Swiss-Prot record:
SUPFAM superfamilies xrefs: Rhodanese/Cell cycle control phosphatase (SSF52821)
Record field: catalytic activity: uridine(34) in tRNA + AH2 + O2 = 5-hydroxyuridine(34) in tRNA + A + H2O
Listed NCBIfam families: PRK01415.1 (NF002397)
SMART domains xref list: RHOD
Gene this protein is translated from: trhO
Top-level division of the source organism's lineage: Bacteria
Organism, scientific name: Rickettsia conorii (strain ATCC VR-613 / Malish 7)
Top-level EC class: oxidoreductase
Coiled coil: none
Active site: C178
Claim: Transmembrane is one of the keywords in the record: no
EC number: 1.14.-.-
Entry protein name: tRNA uridine(34) hydroxylase
Lineage: Bacteria, Pseudomonadati, Pseudomonadota, Alphaproteobacteria, Rickettsiales
InterPro entries with a match to the protein in the record: Rhodanese-like_dom, Rhodanese-like_dom_sf, TrhO, TRHO_N
């Protein structure tokens, strides 16, 4: 029986002084361990998704943690019959998720996590609004029943949407959601920085929610868009193959 391919996604907002210096080290261990995928490095932290054997993707993650020294890392592992990535890339970026807002310190200043098991109960409270921080083409594929779609083409447009919708957000508990946690985490930092106090985000994102809850209350509708060769997954995390997902 062939071993399943492990797909590991990990991110952390942590100060990295010289991220460019880490690139050759990560490429070396990744290629030695036959790992494929993409790792983004920036002064604000790292964000990566890569595939290989379970042992090898964890060895690459261990090296990444050793080189960057984060206090905590958000990690998610799924499995596939094939590699969803073609090769290994390690890239230097200004931000690990581009918002184009200077001065955010997400590591120290962000909203509160809501565990997947508590999410359904939390978002059905009357004073809670849910904001899907993903792009509109992702939301089209699937989202939560009550979620607001900001109709953004890129994450860089999200800060402008917030500025234009302050009356909508005023006096509410704001619950952010995204695929794996990183965009909603950075979004909470933005909202906290401009004065919103009750800001929350789904820990581990939609993928962790679907794995932990199996969508038992049917608050999630549709599939979840993913940025690899699977294109989207169902609420049991099975890959979706449909012509309209070929972008």
């Amino acid at each position: 029986m062939n071993e399943k391919i492990a797909i590991l996604s990990a991110y952390s907002f942590v100060n990295i002084e010289e991220p460019a210096n880490l690139i050759p080290k990560l490429l070396l261990i990744g290629k030695r361990k036959y790992v494929r995928g993409t790792i983004l490095l920036a002064n604000e932290g790292f964000n990566g998704s890569f595939s290989g054997s379970y042992e090898n993707v964890n060895l690459v993650l261990e090296e990444l943690i050793k080189l960057t020294g984060p206090k905590d890392v958000n990690v998610k592992i799924n499995y596939s019959d094939v590699h969803p990535f073609q090769k290994l890339k390690v890239r230097l970026k200004k931000e690990i998720v581009a918002m184009n807002v200077d001065g955010l310190n997400v590591d120290l200043f962000k909203g509160e996590y809501i565990e997947p098991k508590d999410w359904d109960e939390f978002i059905t409270q009357q004073d809670v609004i849910v904001i899907d921080t993903r792009n509109d083409y992702e939301v089209e594929v699937g989202t939560f029943k009550s979620a607001i779609n900001p109709n953004t083409k890129t994450f860089k447009q999200f800060p402008a949407w917030v500025q234009q919708n302050q009356e909508l957000l005023k006096g509410k508990k704001i619950a952010m959601v995204c695929t794996g946690g990183i965009r909603c985490e950075k979004s909470t930092s933005l909202l906290k920085s401009i004065g919103y106090d009750e800001v929350y985000h789904l820990k581990g994102g939609i993928l962790q929610y679907l794995e932990d809850t199996q969508n038992k209350n049917n608050l999630w509708q549709g599939e979840c868009f993913v940025f690899d060769d699977r294109r989207a997954v169902t609420d049991d995390l099975s890959p979706v193959e449909r012509h309209w997902l070929q972008r």
